[in-house]
């Protein structure tokens, strides 16, 4: 899910991953105890500049929450050109779909700079939610909201591109 980097400025460090989870759109409705349980299943990872974190078409099993740094998200076009579709900053997340389905990644994510992230693996995530229905409901509701927002953004982009394509045909 993307948001303006103004919510947390890129590169700003927090005391611990619970602070970042609390500010994340996926986890902002959780109690302190629930946040601590989610943080406990996460693993902090670091990535150097230009490191590929996830690759389009690879099978995924992790969600990443950006704790420090920024990343670019891109798709590879038929011409093999990389088309950057988004930039994500501190507090943003990616890979959440991998926690729900067992499908290939839809895009590649590369570190724009040295990054620190909290990685949550699907198996650990599923075990946590199986133990607590109320927590599962809160998190799945947030996932649905995040995915709906992405669908809206994608629809807006599609309409814009289609409109631009129609406009170019009129000019020609």
Role assignments for model-derived ranges:
Residues 1-172:
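Cytosolic regulatory regions built on CNB/CRP/Popeye-like sensor folds
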């Amino acid at each position: 899910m993307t948001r303006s980097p103004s919510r947390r400025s890129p590169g700003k460090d927090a005391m611990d991953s619970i602070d970042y989870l609390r500010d994340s759109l996926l986890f902002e409705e959780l109690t302190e105890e629930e946040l601590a349980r989610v943080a406990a299943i996460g693993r902090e990872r670091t990535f150097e500049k230009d490191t590929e974190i996830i690759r389009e078409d690879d099978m995924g099993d992790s969600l990443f929450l950006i704790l420090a740094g920024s990343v670019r998200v891109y798709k590879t076009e038929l011409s093999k050109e990389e088309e950057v579709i988004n930039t994500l900053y501190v507090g943003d997340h990616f890979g959440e779909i991998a926690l729900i389905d067992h499908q290939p990644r839809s895009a590649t994510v590369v570190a724009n700079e040295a990054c620190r992230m909290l990685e949550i693996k699907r198996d650990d995530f599923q075990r946590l939610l199986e133990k607590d229905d109320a927590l599962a409901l809160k998190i799945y509701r947030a996932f649905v909201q995040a995915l709906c927002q992405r669908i809206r953004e994608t629809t807006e982009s599609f309409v814009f591109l289609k409109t631009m394509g129609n406009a170019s045909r009129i000019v020609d």
